[in-house]
């Protein structure tokens, strides 16, 4: 299997300039980004140690990804989907199609497409990606960049040299992916994407959910489902059916992060057990961001 890591998370926004300004208040360095030729979208990036957040906006509804347009129309700004990084996209697509042909999964990897971003300074960054169809909502897609490691990181910064984040953000620790049932979530990633869970099922009391974990070479997926009528996860299931609900990021100092965010007028809550900092989604353009100590 060559699906190795969480490559990036897409955050749908209506206005890129306003989104970039708000994310700077959250202590992120935000790149100048660029446009996707013939795809009707533009972006700004938050480049992390081993992945990135993509603030993505639609500027041509007829050319843009239909699911992205629909998401903004129906749900407003917030977490849209994410991409798995692949070291051999053709092999991963072939495995996906084999599992589909054998009736193991209803998900299907589509024909890989070439992608490109052009910065305002005319620098270009390319990739190949495969969207995944089937299911009832937008699915995580697969991507293989035209560069790796430090070369890829430099390209993500575009026209300017790499910069650190004022708040010291490190990596994507994990993604919270919600499903109506844990069985459905496990089958989705096991049978569709070929991932393997590790460990036993556990309970998250604060979210009233049952959960399992799928570790990757970089980061991990927390698949969680509500186990009570009072679970806060039920609202997400009712609205979205399934998908990414939260992003957990590392920082070097939780108390320092909380103080910095409060100084920017950002509303937060702290976990009484771990001290984790959760940014109010209203202050992150609808995205649920949780900070943990690296």
Name these PLM-found stretches.
Residues 1-6, 11-30, 48-199, 205-294:
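Glyoxalase I/VOC metalloenzyme domain signal
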Residues 44-46:
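Short beta-strand scaffold segments in enzyme catalytic cores
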Residues 31-35:
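Membrane-interface helix-loop junction between the first two transmembrane segments
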């Amino acid at each position: 299997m060559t699906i190795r890591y969480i490559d990036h998370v897409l955050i749908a926004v209506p206005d890129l300039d306003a989104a970039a300004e708000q994310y700077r208040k959250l202590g992120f360095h935000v790149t100048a980004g660029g446009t996707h030729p013939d795809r009707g979208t533009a972006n700004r990036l938050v480049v992390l140690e081993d992945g990135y957040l993509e603030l993505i906006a639609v500027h041509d509804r007829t050319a843009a990804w239909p699911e992205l347009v629909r998401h903004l129309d129906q749900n407003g700004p917030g977490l849209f989907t994410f991409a798995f990084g692949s070291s051999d996209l053709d092999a991963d697509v072939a495995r996906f199609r084999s599992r589909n042909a054998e009736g193991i999964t209803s998900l299907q990897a589509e024909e890989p497409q070439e992608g490109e971003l052009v910065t305002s300074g005319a620098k270009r960054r390319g990739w190949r990606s495969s969207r995944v169809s089937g299911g009832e909502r937008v699915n995580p897609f697969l991507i293989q960049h035209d560069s790796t490691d430090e070369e890829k990181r430099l390209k993500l910064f575009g026209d300017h040299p790499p910069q650190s984040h004022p708040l010291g953000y490190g990596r994507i620790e994990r993604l919270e992916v919600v499903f109506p049932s844990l069985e459905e979530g496990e089958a989705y990633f096991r049978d569709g994407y070929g991932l393997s869970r590790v460990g036993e099922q556990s309970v998250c009391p604060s979210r009233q959910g049952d959960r399992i974990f799928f570790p990757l070479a970089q980061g991990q997926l927390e698949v969680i489902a509500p186990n009570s009528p009072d679970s806060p996860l039920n609202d997400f299931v009712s609205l979205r059916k399934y998908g990414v609900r939260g992003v957990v990021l590392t920082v070097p100092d939780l108390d320092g992060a909380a103080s910095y965010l409060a100084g920017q007028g950002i509303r937060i809550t702290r976990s009484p057990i771990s001290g984790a900092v959760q940014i109010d989604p209203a202050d992150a353009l609808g995205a649920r961001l949780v900070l943990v100590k690296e």
